[in-house]
Amino acid sequence: MIKNNYNSSEAKSYIDQAGKDLADQELALRVYTSRIIGQNPDLVMHGGGNTSVKVERKDLFGNTKQVIHVKGSGWDLDTIQAPGLPGLWLDPLRELRNLDKLSDEDMVNVQRANLLDSSAPNPSVETLLHAFLPHKFVDHTHATPFLILANLQIGRAHV
């Protein structure tokens, strides 16, 4: 059984440090919960897995738009900081669901083109999975017990 390591006072500390902007507070909470996940070796192997949060931010013209912050390449969940969860404009990513096919190169180009900060790390290769799911917070882990089961000959019947 997985122990719940969430601590309300620790979470509040992360949120308080983020300032008054609601999107920054939600991102700070995502950083906190990502670290909890990343520090559990039964849930992640070598810092792997991905987390995301969907927030609202204003674009250059002052329009409120949906943004997804998703773990970037090169960051480990157990030590992640806000820059390790680059923000992307969400609507263009969701439009990709309407395509019959999408090459890896086109996917990466669309993701890079929709980063809020062009110098941010590449977002996870699973960014579209996170974007297509409706949930505000998404956790995608590489849980060791399930990976073991899935790789056994008889595993598929039990996963």
Model-derived features: positions:
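N-terminal low-complexity or amphipathic/hydrophobic leaders
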Residues: 22-107, 128, 132
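Conserved small/polar residues in nucleotide/adenosyl-binding loops
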Residues: 157-159
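Short, functional N-terminal and low-complexity linear motifs
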Residues: 19-20, 95-97, 147-151
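Short, glycine/charge-rich beta-strand/loop segments that flank catalytic centers
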Residues: 48-51, 111-115, 143-145
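NAD(P)-dependent dehydrogenase/reductase Rossmann-like domain
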Residues: 109-137
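Histidine-centered catalytic micro-motifs
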Residues: 135-155
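Generic N-terminal amphipathic, Lys/Arg-enriched alpha-helix
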Residues: 1-21
